[in-house]
Each structure stands twice: as C-alpha cells, then as structure tokens.
Amino acid sequence: MIPQIKKILFATDLSKNSAYAFFYAIHMAKRDEAKIVIMHAIEPIAPMLVDFEDFKYQVAKDRWEETVIKFKERIQDISVKADARTGVSSVDLISNILIRPGNPVEEILKVADEEDCDVIVLGSHGKGFLEKTFLGSVSSSVLLRTRKPVFVIPLPSEDTTVDLV
C-alpha cells in the first residue's frame, strides 16, 4: 500500500527550474490534501569571519540578511504566479517557510525529518542568485541519502512557455 502524502518538502534555490517544480508541489498538495513546507539553504557566515575583523563580519552579515529578504520576495513572486496559473491559493497549502544556514543536502535531509515530510520535491539543475549549482548535484545526493520518495522536476521542453521569473 502506498502511504498517503500529508506533507511535502519543497526545497528551492529560487531558480526558474525550482519555481517550475513548485507547480508540482502545489498540484500534489491539492490532490492529496497535503501541506507544503518550503525551504532554502544558504551558506552560513564563515566561522573565521566571526572572529576576524568587524568590518568583514558585518559585510557577511549584511549579505546574509539581504539574501533572506530576496528569498522572501522571490517566494512571494513565485506564489503569486503559481496561484494565477493553478487557480489554487498556495498560501492555504503552505504550512512553513524555512531559511536554513548550511549545506543544502544536509539541510534538506534535516528538514524532511524534522517536519515529518512524506516526500521531497526538487527542481533539477537550478542555478540560484548566489551562482552556486544547487539542484543538480544536490538532487543526486538527496536521492542517495534519503528513504523518502523524491520528485526531481526538470524544466519543460523549450516549446512550453513558463513565465516564472
């Protein structure tokens, strides 16, 4: 018997690829009457900067705070477009939005367990505004290290129009 999906972890790097994957998470949540946990992992402030010069630490801290603000704005933009496209209010489906400092793979696995998620949804081969590859090697590593079902969603073919960014 296939277990019922009650909670979906949607991990995002805020790329077009992961925004498209959000449609899948919304569709799954609506179909299964499930909730969505949205999470994004950000590289933490380097420990050496904490004890280093105050100026460098402040720059790193400001960059972190700026990234958090961009993340929240981006999630809002993606949600509005997803709502218009799917006809479903994603706000009603989202149970939590998390921004975690740390390695994306480690944080995805931790959040999936902490939030008791039944499945994980990822976009494939995304590249976020921090210009680090996120959901190519990340999706592979998550697949290898979790016992939960993982949905890796590629962008549609070039013939398909996707207005997400």
Residue map of PLM features:
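Structural beta-alpha unit
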Residues: 1-3, 45, 80-120, 157-165
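Small/aliphatic-rich secondary-structure junction motif
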Residues: 2-58, 87, 165
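Gly/Ser-rich helix-loop-strand patches that form or flank binding pockets
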Residues: 4, 110-162
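General small-molecule cofactor/ligand-binding pocket signal
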Residues: 39, 96-100, 151
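Redox- and metal-dependent alpha/beta enzyme cores, enriched for Fe-S-associated oxidoreductases
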Residues: 41-44, 70-72, 83
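A short acidic, glycine-rich active-site loop
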Residues: 57-73
